[in-house]
């Protein structure tokens, strides 16, 4: 397992960069809102060296390109990109490992005199990074108890148990993600508090003074775009991509195999549904995930919101630059 991958070399500028220009930017929002395009436009308009860090847990996996809408290597060549293609599909992505590796990457970029731009929508991963989450201890016996309960009643029923104990946690954890469901129940039992209570509130200063920009994308605008994007993924070869990755260890039991689109295609390949049903289920799952992302991010008062319906990355990037200038001068 190698989290350290960077797409392109970095060069340190001469002289010392003012501290304010080293503050990371974090671009968040629901899937399909245009975060990656915006990150590139902002990087082009900043009058300083910039390096980009991936904040999408599934884009960390090698070969998972079509179904994650990952920028191509050619698109990533314009600026150094980090934490893309750094895991094999049979590796387990971890919030704690991401916090540590992305944090080290931020500080290495700053040491080179460049500004980090973090871009993605993986909710807990990003908050763990910018708020330096400290994770509660684990207890093997408690975890084993909840895993046994999952085996007894099934993962979807266990998700309902989580909802009864902590509705907010159930809203953000996918109902078919047994590892995170079990972990949340473990934390709740060990601490006697809701899962999120073990983490810092969202109204405290961010780590490194990170500035957060969010793309606001209402469902009536985003949902048709998401369906069209799913259609493009299937047309571009998502099924063949999944078939190839299956030979490299992608399975429904792996973390990568639970990614939206990949899980549905794996079910179809196993004969459990038609490929058309897999496409429809992918659309439904993507829309549900976008709703969870919107719910998570709108609770953070530190986010400066941008209107994704403008659908013009250049115009939105200009708004980001203007906001940075105003707050710096103010």
UniProtKB/Swiss-Prot annotation:
Positions of the UniProt region annotated as Disordered: 1-21
The superkingdom listed in its UniProt entry is Bacteria
The enzyme class is transferase
Statement: the UniProt record of this protein carries the keyword Electron transport: no
Enzyme Commission code: 2.5.1.75
Which keywords annotate this record?
ATP-binding, Magnesium, Nucleotide-binding, Transferase, tRNA processing
Quick one: which residues bind ATP?
A: 29-36
Q: Which GO terms describe its biological process?
A: tRNA modification
Q: Which InterPro entries match?
A: Dimethylallyltransferase, IPT, P-loop_NTPase
Catalyzes what?
Answer: adenosine(37) in tRNA + dimethylallyl diphosphate = N(6)-dimethylallyladenosine(37) in tRNA + diphosphate
Gene Ontology MF annotations: ATP binding; tRNA dimethylallyltransferase activity
Compositional bias of type Polar residues: which residue ranges?
Answer: 1-11
| Pfam short name (any one) | IPPT
List the residues marked with site Interaction with substrate tRNA: 122, 143
Renumbered to this chain, region (Interaction with substrate tRNA) spans: 56-59
> So which residues are the signal peptide here?
none
Q: Where does substrate bind?
A: 31-36
Indicate the quaternary assembly.
Monomer.
What is known about what this protein does? Catalyzes the transfer of a dimethylallyl group onto the adenine at position 37 in tRNAs that read codons beginning with uridine, leading to the formation of N6-(dimethylallyl)adenosine (i(6)A).
The record's listing under HAMAP family reads: IPP_trans
| UniProt similarity note | Belongs to the IPP transferase family.
Q: What is this protein called?
A: tRNA dimethylallyltransferase
Native species of this protein? Corynebacterium urealyticum (strain ATCC 43042 / DSM 7109)
Gene name of this polypeptide: miaA
């Amino acid at each position: 397992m190698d989290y350290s991958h960077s797409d392109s070399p970095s060069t340190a500028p001469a002289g010392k960069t003012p501290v304010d220009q080293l503050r990371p930017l974090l671009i968040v929002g629901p899937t399909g809102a245009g975060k990656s395009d915006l990150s590139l436009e902002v990087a082009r308009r900043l009058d300083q060296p910039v390096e980009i860090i991936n904040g999408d847990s599934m884009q960390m996996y090698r070969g998972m390109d079509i179904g994650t809408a990952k920028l191509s290597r050619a698109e990533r060549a314009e600026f150094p990109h980090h934490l893309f293609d750094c895991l094999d599909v049979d590796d387990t992505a971890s919030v704690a490992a991401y916090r540590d590796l992305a944090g080290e990457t931020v500080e290495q970029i700053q040491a080179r005199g460049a500004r980090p731009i973090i871009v993605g929508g993986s909710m807990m991963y990003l908050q763990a990074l910018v708020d330096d989450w400290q994770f509660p201890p684990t207890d093997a016996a408690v975890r084993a108890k909840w895993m046994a309960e999952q085996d007894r009643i099934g993962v979807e029923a266990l998700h309902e148990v989580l909802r009864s104990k902590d509705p907010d946690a159930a809203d953000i954890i996918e109902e078919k993600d047994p590892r995170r469901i079990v972990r949340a129940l473990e934390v709740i039992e060990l601490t006697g508090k809701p899962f999120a209570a073990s983490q810092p509130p969202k109204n405290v200063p961010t780590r490194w003074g990170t500035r957060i920009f969010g793309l606001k994308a209402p469902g009536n605008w985003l949902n048709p775009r998401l369906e069209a994007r799913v259609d493009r993924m299937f047309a571009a070869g998502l099924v063949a991509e999944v078939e190839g990755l299956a030979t490299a260890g992608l399975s429904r039991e792996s973390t990568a195999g639970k990614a939206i689109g990949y899980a549905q295609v794996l079910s179809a390949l196993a004969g459990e549904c038609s490929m058309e049903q897999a496409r429809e289920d992918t659309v439904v799952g993507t829309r549900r995930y976008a709703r969870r992302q919107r719910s998570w991010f709108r609770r953070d008062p530190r986010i400066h919101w941008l209107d994704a319906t403008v659908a013009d990355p250049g115009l939105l990037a200009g708004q980001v630059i203007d906001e940075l200038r105003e707050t710096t001068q103010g």
